[in-house]
Amino acid sequence: MSGGIKQWPEDERPREKLLKRGAKALSDAELLALIIGTGDSSSGRSALDIGREMLQDFGGLRNLAHATASEICRIKGAGPAKAACIKAALELANRYGARRFESLERFTSPSQVFEHFHHEFRDHRKEYFLTLLLDGKNRILKRVQISEGSLNQSIVHPREVFNQAVRESAAAIILVHNHPTGDPTPSREDIDITRRLREAGDLLGIKVLDHIIIGDGSFLSFVDRGMM
């Protein structure tokens, strides 16, 4: 559909469609168009055209979220103001996911952890390993990042993992890390690290409840798989 969005039939305009049918009725490109706001008068391209080009050039929302403002500005019609609006909207989405997790009183299932962390990790190209510290009633005390980059036993050392747990008087911990490849299948290194940390936790009286690997749209729980 050509021409400015204002010239389109009302039912096809992203803003009117959202108000009438709800945000879920809109495509990713239409939601981006609302954030972008205006098109490019010099080329006659609408905000929706620009949104579609962004998704195509970056290969989807995941890569767009990882792009810098300057990279977004390379799209014709997307200047610094539009790039800033897009980065702000994506950051708000990330913060919303984080707040939902922080409001949880206690850990009840691996899927809870996945629901939070897949939003946070999906844009990362590196592996991140962190721990969730829990009290005796499985209430979340704190999250602690242990390492960034490829996992190995020299980086994910029991001393680093349990240092904060001891300081916070944690009764248990949950291990969490991501696989940037998107496949949550554990490597031999993942399995060995989990065994080593579980043994160290037993000696310290701090139970390792689970190790959850976050993939792209899926996760693996060591406990659910009977691996610990």
From Swiss-Prot:
<dbReference type="GO" id="GO:0006508">
    <property type="term" value="P:proteolysis"/>
</dbReference>
<feature type="binding site">
    <location>
        <position position="177"/>
    </location>
    <ligand>
        <name>Zn(2+)</name>
    </ligand>
</feature>
<dbReference type="GO" id="GO:0046872">
    <property type="term" value="F:metal ion binding"/>
</dbReference>
<dbReference type="InterPro" id="IPR010994">
    <property type="entry name" value="RuvA_2-like"/>
</dbReference>
<dbReference type="InterPro" id="IPR001405">
    <property type="entry name" value="UPF0758"/>
</dbReference>
<keyword id="KW-0862">Zinc</keyword>
<keyword id="KW-0482">Metalloprotease</keyword>
<dbReference type="GO" id="GO:0008237">
    <property type="term" value="F:metallopeptidase activity"/>
</dbReference>
<comment type="similarity">
    <text>Belongs to the UPF0758 family.</text>
</comment>
<feature type="short sequence motif" description="JAMM motif">
    <location>
        <begin position="177"/>
        <end position="190"/>
    </location>
</feature>
<protein>
    <recommendedName>
        <fullName>UPF0758 protein Gura_4138</fullName>
    </recommendedName>
</protein>
<keyword id="KW-0645">Protease</keyword>
<dbReference type="InterPro" id="IPR037518">
    <property type="entry name" value="MPN"/>
</dbReference>
<dbReference type="InterPro" id="IPR046778">
    <property type="entry name" value="UPF0758_N"/>
</dbReference>
<dbReference type="Pfam" id="PF20582">
    <property type="entry name" value="UPF0758_N"/>
</dbReference>
<feature type="binding site">
    <location>
        <position position="190"/>
    </location>
    <ligand>
        <name>Zn(2+)</name>
    </ligand>
</feature>
<dbReference type="InterPro" id="IPR025657">
    <property type="entry name" value="RadC_JAB"/>
</dbReference>
<keyword id="KW-0378">Hydrolase</keyword>
<feature type="binding site">
    <location>
        <position position="179"/>
    </location>
    <ligand>
        <name>Zn(2+)</name>
    </ligand>
</feature>
<keyword id="KW-0479">Metal-binding</keyword>
<dbReference type="Pfam" id="PF04002">
    <property type="entry name" value="RadC"/>
</dbReference>
<feature type="domain" description="MPN">
    <location>
        <begin position="106"/>
        <end position="228"/>
    </location>
</feature>
